[in-house]
Swiss-Prot record:
It is found in: Secreted; Cytoplasm. Disulfide bonds join 119-152, 285-294, 287-304, 306-315, 318-338, 341-350, 343-368, 371-380, 383-401, 404-416, 406-423, 425-434, 437-451, 472-544, 491-601. It comes from the Eukaryota. In the embryo, widely expressed in the developing nervous system and in mesodermal tissues. The lineage of its organism: Eukaryota, Metazoa, Chordata, Craniata, Vertebrata. The gene is Ntn1. SMART domains: C345C, EGF_Lam, LamNT. Residues 1-24 form the signal peptide. Netrins control guidance of CNS commissural axons and peripheral motor axons. Its association with either DCC or some UNC5 receptors will lead to axon attraction or repulsion, respectively. Binding to UNC5C might cause dissociation of UNC5C from polymerized TUBB3 in microtubules and thereby lead to increased microtubule dynamics and axon repulsion. Involved in dorsal root ganglion axon projection towards the spinal cord. It also serves as a survival factor via its association with its receptors which prevent the initiation of apoptosis. Residues 285-340, 341-403, 404-453 form the Laminin EGF-like domain. GO terms for cellular component: actin cytoskeleton; basement membrane; cell periphery; collagen-containing extracellular matrix; cytoplasm; cytosol; extracellular region; glutamatergic synapse. Pfam families: EGF_laminin (PF00053), EGF_LMN_ATRN (PF24973), Laminin_N (PF00055), NTR (PF01759). This is Netrin-1.
């Protein structure tokens, strides 16, 4: 009998080794350590390959929580044996306080010696509807190959095996054993297993015979008869089916000889109990093909020693910064290692984008976050605005991007050419940073037109007119302080308007300002309307800050009537009065209007 038991367990271990071989990992061999590669997770060329932890009895040495144990208080129990047709009973005492007479749960998972069996034992005659449960926590997720129990008593008439995948919070059935499946568990007897239900528990009457009275075995193989077992790598259903963090065995109904209700039923009932010498859970630490062993972490929790740039207790996610493709379980063909994002050494964080991954032909989906060293882009592969590439350094260099340093006055913007570093210069300005006037231009005092053409002096004759001044100081006197506005100045000009400068454009020898005329306080023969209008000022006047004017500012403009280049705008020149607007002036200008109507401008 004992020989048959050990032959059955040996067969299960052989199945486990075969499954390990199919998955590409080591089996149970006394020479495995000698034949193994130096790094089981990489091949001889250093390329990643699938690796799995050794096959173990995950129950060995672990605590088992049981709902019933004999010996508290001490109680009699009887062992039944048969001699021919004669049934014999030898009675003993179970006493939890006496180590020689105790049958604690620790005997379930200790070293199983067939020559010196140690048995856990329940209280006597806990018959249906009462049950007895054994609950084993594996400490982490395992991929379970089999669950086996060797009995010191007759095997149960009805028994169920459950598993938990969330550390005992919820339970799902793994397997049922009963001679009355429908009555006990509301399950059909030996229902066929198909691809549609291969993740469901079945009920069978195998292993439920009362005999042998001692030494019987119940062994459940998780993949036996499952249609997708031969293609386990590509079956997420079965991968989920064999995964467990906890195992629970529920003994539901005792096998009896039917004598428990006879006159001497007390002796008979003391002969019916559950006793188990060995509980085994054969399997491997679940690491999804990305680790060759499990280790204890700082919290003494069992975790996978992850490789292939993976992380997590089961190597079930990519470690930080390795999100260039989605996490996948390793297979015999592909290690499916996690790949680092390509950020050219300029970022420490990245994220995965499925749309980009699909567009790349499922090659790359990483997006870099918070690019440093003045870089930008999905891969931190170009320079951000205001910087350009230093082609003398590789893109991975921390100084691969140089500041444009565009001149605040000479440049038309802060962004330069990404390759050459050339800033966009205003008219008449040159240099890579727009920091000097071009040939034929001279510096002015205007931030709008910092460089103006050098005037060409006309030929001198006796009848020639006075020459144009050579510099701004002799041409006009720019305002250096606050300008004052009074009735006399108001009366001397043809128009007085409040304007808002919107934008400025160069037009030949003129600057054309688009302005919004907010209020009209005086106008000459040409009618001035409120709204958007063109204001024309000669380039020389702007260059010499006569008048001094800036975009996006509001001004009070007093000028003389003059035909504009477009015949519809107004003209200002070096003689015009341009003062930055103050709201307090509106009332004073209305008074000037009233005085003008009364003819006081003629006196002024």
């Amino acid at each position: 009998m004992m020989r048959a038991v050990w032959e059955a367990l040996a067969a299960l271990a052989a199945v486990a080794c075969l499954v390990g071989a199919v998955r590409g990992g080591p089996g149970l061999s006394m020479f495995a350590g000698q034949a193994a590669q130096p790094d089981p997770c990489s091949d001889e060329n250093g390329h990643p390959r699938r690796c799995i932890p050794d096959f173990v009895n995950a129950a060995f040495g672990k605590d088992v929580r049981v709902s019933s144990t004999c010996g508290r208080p001490p109680a009699r129990y009887c062992v039944v044996s048969e001699r021919g047709e004669e049934r014999l009973r030898s009675c003993h005492l179970c006493n939890s306080s006496d180590p020689k007479k105790a049958h604690p749960p620790a005997f379930l998972t200790d070293l199983n010696n067939p020559h010196n069996l140690t048995c856990w034992q329940s209280e006597n005659y806990l018959q249906f509807p009462h049950n007895v449960t054994l609950t084993l926590s594996l400490g982490k997720k395992f991929e379970v190959t089999y669950v086996s129990l060797q009995f010191c008593s007759p095997r149960p008439e009805s028994m169920a095996i459950y598993k938990s995948m969330d550390y005992g919070r919820t339970w799902v059935p793994f397997q049922f054993y009963s001679t009355q499946c429908r009555k006990m568990y509301n399950r059909p007897h030996r229902a066929p297993i198909t691809k549609q239900n291969e993740q469901e528990a079945v009920c069978t009457d195998s292993h439920t015979d009362m005999r042998p009275l001692s030494g019987g075995l119940i062994a459940f193989s998780t993949l036996d008869g499952r249609p997708s077992a031969h293609d386990f790598d590509n079956s997420p259903v079965l991968q989920d089916w064999v995964t467990a963090t906890d195992i629970r065995v529920a003994f539901s109904r005792l096998h009896t000889f039917g004598d428990e209700n006879e006159d001497d039923s007390e002796l008979a009932r003391d002969s019916y109990y559950y006793a188990v010498s060995d509980l085994q859970v054969g399997g491997r630490c679940k690491c999804n093909g990305h680790a060759a062993r499990c280790v204890r972490d700082r919290d003494d929790s069992l975790v996978c020693d992850c490789r292939h740039n993976t992380a997590g207790p089961e190597c079930d996610r990519c470690k930080p910064f390795h999100y260039d493709r989605p996490w996948q379980r390793a297979t015999a063909r592909e290690a499916n290692e996690c790949v680092a994002c390509n950020c050219n050494l300029h970022a420490r964080r990245c994220r995965f984008n499925m749309e980009l991954y699909k567009l790349s032909g499922r090659k790359s989906g990483g997006v870099c976050l918070n690019c440093r060293h003045n870089t930008a882009g999905r891969h931190c592969h170009y320079c951000k605005e205001g910087f350009y590439r230093d082609m003398g350094k590789p893109i991975t260099h921390r100084k691969a991007c140089k500041a444009c340093d565009c001149h605040p006055v000479g440049a038309a913007g802060k962004t330069c050419n990404q390759t050459t570093g050339q800033c966009p210069c205003k008219d008449g300005v040159t240099g890579i940073t727009c920091n000097r006037c071009a040939k034929g231009y001279q510096q002015s005092r205007s931030p709008i037109a910092p460089c103006i053409k050098i005037p060409v002096a006309p030929p001198t004759t006796a009848a020639s007119s006075v020459e144009e001044p050579e510099d701004c100081d002799s041409y006009c006197k720019a305002s250096k302080g606050k300008l004052k506005m009074n009735m006399k100045k108001y009366c001397r000009k043809d128009y007085a308007v409040q304007i808002h400068i919107l934008k400025a454009d160069k037009a030949g020898d003129w600057w054309k300002f688009t302005v919004n005329i907010i209020s009209v306080y005086k106008q000459g023969t040409s009618r001035i309307r409120r709204g958007d209008q063109s204001l024309w000022i000669r380039s020389r006047d702007i260059a010499c800050k006569c008048p001094k004017i800036k975009p996006l500012k509001k001004y009070l403009l007093l000028g003389n009537a003059e035909d504009s280049p477009d015949q519809s705008g107004i003209v200002a020149d070096k003689s015009s009065l341009v003062i930055q607007w103050r709201d307090t002036w509106a009332r004073r200008l209305r008074k000037f209007q009233q005085r003008e109507k009364k003819g006081k401008c003629k006196k002024a």
